[in-house]
């Protein structure tokens, strides 16, 4: 065969064949050297020959013998990290490349930490957010466990807080007890100076408030009407006066005017009727004109004269109302200096610590004096004191002490007569519907209902006779 023939079959020249060709005397030594044999292909457990993949595992471990390799790994793991050479060198292992790699691998196996793998910079969409949430939840769990491990200290703190609160409550109790003992030690005629609280408020005029109310008490005697003026009114009766005032209360409520306006209007009517004779058909005109004058005197924005003409069902023209206004003012000599009972009620309410319920009932009881002619002979300060006394009695607010008597200006004995007249009016059947409905609303705390219920139960303690007839049946001479 020609060796240079490129189309001929190529023969493989191995190292053994090359050695045989180069040997000059192969039989000189008497024994021929065996040629180097090629490495046998690895066979599997079934004896079949297995080919190694081009880029497969270098360790020649295939799928067929996974069990054998696992057993081998288990055996090597049992022996530990120290090799035979390490044992012979007295426990000091010589550092070599293989040893370094093995030591690093062993250290990695023994010191595996989950956060170390999570600390790598993740790519987009690698789920790093969930890993961070997991670590934060682990931290919160650790904090919870730390908090659960500290109950004794917290219990001690809570006990200290409870002890401090108990001490504070005991101190408050001691202060209250001391205040109560001081109140008990005070004499019964002790009068508290309540005006010193208003020294910094210029609107209260605390420096000369005493002189102001002394002047009002002098002035109220000058503005009292004649309690018997009905005697020289041939066409009028007390019943008609009550009907007129009840209608004026309805007008006053519709226009939403001040309480002072209503009291001044009724006082103007009584003072004018004490000086002039009025026919029955002109009585309503006197009432409308008096309300018009009072609204001008007390209100910031008073209703127009046309409004008063309208509420009177156009019975009187605007000119008639204006003419009546001029005539009334001329008769009274333009004297509108009327000491309103609301001023006295506010003065007494200061000693009552401005209790809103007591004050509302007091306003209702004071307005009784507008409808009942029997109150015409009493000054407004006495009516205000009696109203406050009865309101406190109904609400059970305590006795009429020296402080209340000082700021009211009347003792219990001095207001007893007016007080009994109020109980008498409350005990009788209702005859002034507008007045009763006004104070039966929630705005006025249902004062008319409450006071009448009280009078029905306790009237026998303060008035002698059990009155059943309505107020309108009272004779003029009573």
Curated annotation (Swiss-Prot):
CDD domains from the UniProt entry: CYCLIN_CLBs_yeast_rpt1, CYCLIN_CLBs_yeast_rpt2
One of the Pfam families matching this protein, by short name: Cyclin_C
SUPFAM superfamilies, per database record: Cyclin-like
UniProt entry keywords in alphabetical sequence: Cell cycle, Cell division, Cyclin, Mitosis
GO cellular component: cyclin-dependent protein kinase holoenzyme complex; cytoplasm; microtubule organizing center; nucleus
Gene3D superfamilies xrefs: Cyclin-like (1.10.472.10)
GO BP terms: cell division; G1/S transition of mitotic cell cycle; traversing start control point of mitotic cell cycle
GO molecular function, one term: cyclin-dependent protein serine/threonine kinase regulator activity
Region ranges (Disordered): 1-153
Alphabetical list of InterPro entries matching this protein: Cyclin (IPR039361), Cyclin-like_dom (IPR013763), Cyclin-like_sf (IPR036915), Cyclin_A/B-like (IPR046965), Cyclin_C-dom (IPR004367), Cyclin_N (IPR006671), Cyclins_cyclin-box (IPR048258)
Extent of Basic and acidic residues compositional bias: 65-74, 110-121
Composition-biased stretches (Polar residues): 77-102, 133-145
Sequence ranges of Low complexity compositional bias: 16-31
Entry superkingdom: Eukaryota
Family, per entry: Belongs to the cyclin family. Cyclin AB subfamily.
The protein's role, per its UniProt record: Essential for the control of the cell cycle at the G2/M (mitosis) transition. Interacts with the CDC2 protein kinase to form MPF. G2/M cyclins accumulate steadily during G2 and are abruptly destroyed at mitosis.
UniProt-recorded name of the protein: G2/mitotic-specific cyclin-B
Originating species: Emericella nidulans (strain FGSC A4 / ATCC 38163 / CBS 112.46 / NRRL 194 / M139)
Gene designation: nimE
């Amino acid at each position: 065969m020609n060796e240079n023939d490129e189309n001929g079959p190529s023969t493989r020249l191995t190292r053994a064949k090359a050695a045989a060709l180069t040997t000059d005397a192969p039989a000189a030594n008497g024994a021929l050297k065996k040629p180097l044999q090629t490495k046998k292909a690895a066979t599997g457990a079934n004896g079949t020959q297995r080919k190694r993949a081009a880029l497969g595992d270098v360790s020649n471990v295939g799928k067929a013998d996974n069990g054998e390799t696992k057993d081998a790994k288990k055996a090597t793991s049992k022996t530990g990290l120290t090799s035979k050479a390490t044992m012979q060198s007295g426990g000091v292992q010589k550092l070599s490349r293989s040893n370094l790699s093995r030591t690093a691998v062993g250290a990695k196996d023994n010191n595996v930490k989950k956060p170390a793998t999570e600390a790598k910079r993740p790519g987009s969409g690698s789920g790093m957010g969930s890993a961070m949430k997991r670590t934060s939840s682990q931290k919160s769990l650790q904090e919870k466990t730390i908090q659960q491990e500290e109950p004794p200290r917290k219990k001690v703190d809570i006990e200290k807080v409870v002890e401090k609160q108990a001490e504070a409550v005991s101190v408050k109790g001691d202060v209250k007890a001391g205040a109560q003992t001081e109140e008990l030690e005070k004499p019964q005629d002790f009068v508290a100076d309540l005006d010193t609280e208003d020294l910094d408020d210029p609107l209260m005029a605390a420096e000369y408030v005493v002189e102001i109310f002394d002047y009002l008490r002098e002035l109220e005697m000058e503005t009292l009407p004649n309690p018997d003026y009905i005697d020289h009114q041939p066409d009028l009766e007390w019943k008609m006066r009550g009907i007129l005032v009840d209608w004026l209360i309805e007008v006053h409520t519709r226009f939403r005017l001040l309480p002072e306006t209503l009291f001044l209007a009724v006082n103007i009517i009584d003072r004018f009727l004490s000086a002039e004779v009025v026919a029955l058909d002109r009585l309503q005109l006197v009432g409308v004109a008096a309300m018009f004058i009072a609204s001008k005197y007390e209100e910031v924005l008073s209703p127009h004269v046309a409004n008063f003409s309208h509420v009177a069902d156009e019975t009187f023209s605007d000119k008639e109302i204006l003419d009546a206004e001029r005539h009334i003012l001329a008769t009274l000599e333009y004297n509108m200096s009327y000491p309103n009972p609301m001023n006295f009620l506010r003065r007494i309410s200061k000693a009552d610590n401005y209790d809103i319920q007591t004050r509302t009932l007091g306003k209702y009881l004071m307005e009784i004096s507008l409808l009942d002619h029997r109150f015409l002979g009493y000054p407004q300060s006495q009516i205000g004191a009696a109203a406050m006394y009865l309101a406190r009695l109904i609400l059970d607010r305590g006795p009429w002490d020296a402080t209340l008597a000082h700021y009211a200006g009347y003792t219990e004995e001095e207001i007893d007569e007016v007080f009994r007249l109020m109980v008498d009016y409350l005990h009788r059947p209702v005859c002034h519907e507008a007045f009763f409905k006004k104070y039966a609303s929630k705005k006025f705390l249902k004062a008319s209902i409450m006071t009448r219920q009280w009078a029905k139960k306790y009237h026998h303690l303060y008035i002698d006779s059990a009155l059943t007839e309505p107020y309108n049946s009272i004779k003029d001479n009573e």
